[in-house]
Amino acid sequence: MRLRDLLQLQVHDLEVEVLTGIYSEETHLPQPLRISVTADIDMPERFDPDTPLGASKSYIDLKHAATTALPRDTHFTLIEAVAEHVCDTLFVSDARVRRVEVRIVKLAISEGGESIGITMVRHRG
């Protein structure tokens, strides 16, 4: 029996300004969000010392999906739509991506240091 191994890549606590929100005070100015992304990808049987970079995935791809790949001129009514966009970006960019988890914390509504937000988990087909 062959095990199905996955490599888990993570980028945590990226602070990003995104047009999001449903309240009038949120709809015209970008809101500060803290985004963390975890992606599970198919991996080779082994990573030997001379394994090429292409056998893995760059964590920069996760950072890109949560920052520069987010459209600056689009208003996301819900932060769930922001998470969906991050997931879609990673699934489209690499067929090896099997699962994406996106955690988003809305920094502007924290009153006592608490984390208020969502976590979305998507699996490829």
Regions found by a protein language model. Give the residues of each.
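N-terminal, polar/charged subdomain of small-to-medium soluble alpha/beta proteins
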Residues: 1-125
